[in-house]
Amino acid sequence: PHMVNAMNCLASAFCILFLFWTITHLARRILTRQGAELTKANIVAVLGTGAVGALAYTFTDTFWFSAIEGEVYALSSMFTALVVWLMLKWEEQADQPHSMRWIVLIAYLMGLSIGVHILNLLTVPALVFIYYFRKTQRITFKGIAVSTLISGAILVFINSIIIPHTVYIGALFDLFFVNSLGLPVNSGLVFFVVALLGALGMGVYFTHKKGRTVLNLVLLSTLMILIGYSSYASVTIRAAANPPMNSNNPSNPFALYSLLNRDQYGDKPLLYGPQFSAPTSGYKYKDVRYLDDDGKYKTVSIISGYEHPDEFMHLFPRMWNYAASKESYKSWSAYRTRTDYERDENGEIVRDAQGRPNKIEVLDFGRRTLWDDGSGYEPLVIVEPTFRENLNYFFTYQLNHMYWRYFLWNFVGRQSDIQPTDAIITDGNWLSGIKWIDELYLGPQDNLPDEIANNKGRNTYYFLPFLLGLIGLIYQLNRDPRNFSIVMWLFVMMGIALVVYFNTSPNEPRERDYVYAGSFYAFCIWIGLGVLAVCDLIVWATRRKGLMAPIAATVVCMVVPGILAAQNWDDHDRSHRTMAR
């Protein structure tokens, strides 16, 4: 445990270092033309932007928690920061000989990061646009569209082809080697890996000889991704040793393929699929292979999911999880109430002593559809969420509660560290510390119980980090729109795009803010660049240039990381926290 914690802290420290270098690079791009000399005042301003932005991210709630947690997200954050900085290094040296070595290194790190977390792949669109902006002088809609398609193709190639299907093809080789040739398990996989790497190596050699630069870079990058991805071999080696903890036992290629394909988590619809109340019309089956006692692969067919009637398949199904309670979905969607007569179990209207019918408020939720299941009985009444209710759930729960709430935790303030089980005003909301704003949606903030008022997770930043980041965002948009779009790609892909992809259900077992750390990392770039805007404001107000303005701007903006550190210290300090206490 101590080594894991130490590694996470060290990885987090390097993440902050690479963030500092990234912010200073982007600040230099704003202050000077490429290749121009920096003045002393500019150097101080650049260092100030890096210090403020990097320290702000250091003390944000989400990153600080991940840095001291024995999980993969600290190392994942380091890989994210590293590949972005390396791509900016390439952009700086793109005209020099052998500058493509930076892209080759990025490809290797991408492959290596797959063994940590696939979240790092979401940096690909930003990296592609860095390449596009560096290689073209005139930005066009066609160029932007092509770059977007290329980045999507790279994501699909790595996530849907390299990660699962290289192992699957190797598993098919292993099936032939074991069942037909009588060779040991994994021998076919080893043969396939050697053959694949050899073929790619030959391709790299011949494309280099013939001067096919682009194809050579593609093949070399693919080779580097696979070499980095080979770190997953340790999973199979460890599983083959049969340790006490051996989840899914990926000791052969087919078991490893199932693990990489995330079969243990089941399927969830993304853009098209059923709602939680959709009836089933049958089972989905798939063939799986396992090793029998004779060391041969056997094939069995297992149930992998449910099939649903076509009329119950819809676009953008956000309320999809049949295991989640219907009431949980209702509380987060646009359900309404209407007045109706109270009825008993026989459907008769209930009346009072004077014979007047009782009226009650009932939920008005969903769309009612009659479905004949072919059993010969009366059609079933299926209550489906409407598209409007789906969108309301998406904006209210998935976007607001599961992303923007976390965003505001980090840059506005946090009410408590108690996870809310519903949309209640006493637990887990954002809190600014500005009384009249907080009372607009949380009610009176006076005379609060001790468990709320003295909760260590109650941190208030008075909107200061948020405002400085917003200033930096607008400043970069006006002064350097190309690099602004790159940071925005990071912010959106590591944030809102993940919200759409994860399609979360109500009542998650834990808070999921750590997933969006990359998005908060991007916003801290804007916090750092906000120092330049404050510096320009001081120069405009005093009519004086020189060292005074950048020094004053840095000192003033240091309030942001200062308040983050001061407010978050008590709930993130791990001193004397042991298993026995």
Placement of each model-derived feature along the sequence:
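Transmembrane-helix signature of polytopic, membrane-embedded enzymes
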Residues: 19-59, 94-101, 480-492, 544-554
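Loop-to-helix entry region of an early transmembrane alpha helix in multi-pass inner-membrane enzymes
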Residues: 2-17, 21, 35, 39, ...
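Aromatic- and kink-enriched transmembrane "portal" helix at the membrane-lumen/periplasm boundary
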Residues: 2-5, 30-43, 53-77, 110-118, ...
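Hydrophobic/aromatic-rich transmembrane helices and adjacent perimembrane loops
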Residues: 490, 496, 508-533
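Signature aromatic-anchored transmembrane alpha helix within multi-pass, membrane-resident enzymes
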Residues: 153, 222-226, 477, 481, ...
